[in-house]
């Protein structure tokens, strides 16, 4: 396999069967045991192909899990009791819930850091056992200076980066010095809102082995169908990411010019936009007036969706008028017509 191929090409070819007489695509292998080994320990050919592919894209050793949140559990399983973890104050609600629960149970201590405060992250790197980064953050799309933080943490704290929003097409955190990358493949990697699956990618094989052991102990193994669906989604990630990025950039620019919109956050690439209205009532009314864009949770699918995260349990810190917009593959002009009519209805 070409070592100089782009990430977009690798997303299509990595992990596929090789050799005469092999199928063009990886088959679904619904096996609970392979010879003398349980598949929950060693995986199935379907998992292995997905892990090989994502590992190639991220530049490390991948392990598939039953869900994105299961990857958080596996990382926590690596920490001794009483460990200190630095986490962003704005991040995925499920991740924060996991850390909050572990802290309440006395398993670890959490230091909550403002995402863009690089100085605070650098200080934490000298004291914490693990730094959990998310860039862009969910749902506010704040950016974290990964290279500066990994440089400060080198030889001290382990650095984990949730790369769900950026995907390997947008950034490869292991190349920036991170130790572990995690993904909710439920989102952009799968891309069709039809699966639950998570992935870790470790820079070192020893660390990957520890994560695989955590998966086995916790029983957080993915189904064969889910692994196959995630691999199928990965094959089109390049074109989906590029198209969604083009549409999102256009829509972010237009949203920024609309009188009803008070703030727009867009990191320059990717499918996610965060924008704010003057208050929760206006945001709720906008959601009610949408015709094409789905008012729904989750993100990263071929269909566009929008949600007011502050209305959801655990996200009260998010501005009350903020809306998280996942841009899909519909015609961007149709998406804008839908947004514009909903925004205009607020007058």
Residue spans for each PLM region:
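Conserved glycine-rich beta-strand-loop-beta hairpin in the small C-terminal domain of fold type I
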Residues: 29-31, 35-37, 248-249, 265-274
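Glycine-rich loop-to-alpha-helix module at the N-terminal edge of alpha/beta enzyme cores
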Residues: 49, 53-57, 63, 70-71
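N-terminal "arm"/small-domain region of PLP-dependent enzymes with the aminotransferase-like
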Residues: 1-53
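Short loop segments at secondary-structure junctions
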Residues: 33-34, 202-207, 234, 276-281
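PLP-dependent enzyme catalytic core of the Aspartate aminotransferase-like
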Residues: 8, 122, 146, 240, ...
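Pocket-edge structural micro-motifs
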Residues: 14, 30-34, 66, 308-310, ...
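Conserved PLP-enzyme active-site core in the AAT-like
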Residues: 2-3, 13, 17, 62-260, ...
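Conserved C-terminal alpha-helix-loop-beta "cap" of PLP-dependent enzymes
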Residues: 267-323, 327, 340-341
């Amino acid at each position: 396999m070409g070592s100089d191929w782009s990430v977009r090409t690798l997303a299509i070819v990595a992990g596929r069967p090789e050799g005469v007489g092999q199928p063009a695509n990886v088959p679904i292998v619904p096996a609970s045991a392979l010879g003398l080994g349980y598949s929950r320990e060693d995986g199935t050919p379907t998992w292995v192909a997905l892990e090989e592919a994502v590992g190639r894209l991220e530049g490390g050793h991948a392990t598939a899990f039953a869900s994105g949140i299961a990857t958080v559990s596996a990382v926590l399983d690596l920490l001794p009791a009483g460990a200190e973890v630095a986490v962003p104050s704005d991040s995925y609600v499920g991740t924060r819930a996991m850390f909050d629960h572990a802290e309440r149970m006395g398993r670890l201590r959490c230091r909550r850091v403002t995402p863009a405060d690089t100085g605070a992250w650098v200080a934490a790197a000298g004291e914490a056992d693990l730094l959990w980064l998310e860039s862009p953050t969910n749902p506010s799309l704040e950016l974290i200076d990964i290279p500066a933080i990994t440089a400060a943490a080198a030889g001290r704290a382990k650095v984990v980066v949730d790369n769900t929003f950026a995907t390997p097409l947008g950034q490869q955190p292991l190349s920036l010095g991170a130790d572990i990358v995690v993904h909710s493949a439920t989102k952009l990697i799968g891309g069709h809102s039809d699966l639950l699956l998570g992935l870790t990618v470790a820079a070192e094989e020893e660390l990957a082995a520890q994560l695989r052991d955590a998966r086995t102990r916790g029983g957080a193994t993915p189904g064969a169908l889910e692994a196959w669906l995630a691999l199928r989604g990965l094959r089109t990630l390049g074109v989906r990411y590029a198209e969604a990025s083009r549409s999102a950039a256009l829509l972010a620019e237009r949203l920024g010019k609309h009188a009803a919109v008070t703030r727009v956050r867009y990191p320059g690439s990717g499918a996610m936009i965060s924008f704010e209205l003057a208050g929760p009532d206006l945001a709720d009314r906008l959601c009610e007036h949408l015709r094409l864009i789905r008012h729904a949770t989750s993100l990263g699918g071929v269909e566009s969706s929008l949600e007011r995260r502050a209305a959801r349990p655990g996200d009260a810190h998010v501005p009350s008028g903020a809306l998280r917009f996942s841009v899909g593959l519909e015609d961007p002009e149709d998406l804008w017509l839908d947004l514009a009519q909903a925004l205009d209805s607020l007058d």
